[in-house]
């Protein structure tokens, strides 16, 4: 996977839900999709435990239904996330950090992650990357950026549970099972 060295901001309305000084009044939940307890997943799990994060792993024990690197197939992952967020759809004080897990380790605690999130001044922040995948013909549709990478990466984003849920339901049903 491409390292997420930069963040691309997706602004969904003005301002943020909570002030920076309200970090202690917010919960931070980490959500991921993984089907097997690989070495990479166990490493991710240990890093989350080290910082006392609640981790919700979706899809564990199921066969992978998210496609492969040859073509797009993220609909299954999105639908699992949508189901999980529906349980939290009214929780404006719960911040959800959705991330890949097989190639990720958490290196900071709640205060540092929420402080960094707050510095963007946006309700939802996505990771970004230098490649337009899986459909490079969409590259021209992405705006130019002054800092960081240009293309959204679904392997890392953060926002309140309610804002993420509303974003996902506004797009209709996701392709893929």
Where on the chain are the PLM-derived regions?
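N-terminal anchoring/stem segment of glycosyltransferases
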Residues: 2-3, 7-95, 119
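Short coil/turn segments at secondary-structure boundaries
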Residues: 42-46, 60-61, 109-112, 169-172
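Conserved hydrophobic/aromatic beta-strand scaffold that supports enzyme active sites
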Residues: 80, 125, 156-158
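Conserved donor-nucleotide/metal-binding helix-loop-beta segment in metal-dependent transferases, i.e.
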Residues: 105-144
């Amino acid at each position: 996977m491409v390292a997420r060295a930069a963040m691309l901001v997706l602004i969904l309305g003005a301002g943020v839900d909570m002030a920076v000084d309200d970090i202690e009044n917010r919960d931070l939940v980490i959500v991921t999709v993984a089907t097997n307890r690989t070495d990479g997943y166990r490493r991710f799990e240990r890093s989350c435990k080290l910082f006392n994060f609640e981790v919700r792993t979706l899809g564990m024990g199921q066969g992978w239904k998210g496609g492969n690197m040859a073509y797009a197939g993220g609909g299954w992952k999105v639908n699992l996330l949508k189901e999980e967020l529906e349980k939290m759809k009214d929780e404006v004080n719960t911040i959800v950090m959705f991330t890949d897990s097989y190639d990720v380790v958490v290196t900071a605690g709640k205060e540092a992650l929420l402080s960094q999130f707050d510095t963007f001044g946006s309700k939802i922040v996505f990771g970004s990357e230098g490649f337009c995948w899986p459909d490079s013909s969409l590259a021209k549709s992405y705006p130019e950026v002054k800092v960081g990478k240009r293309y959204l990466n679904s392997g890392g984003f953060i926002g309140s549970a309610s804002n993420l849920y509303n974003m996902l339901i506004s797009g209709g049903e996701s392709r893929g099972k």
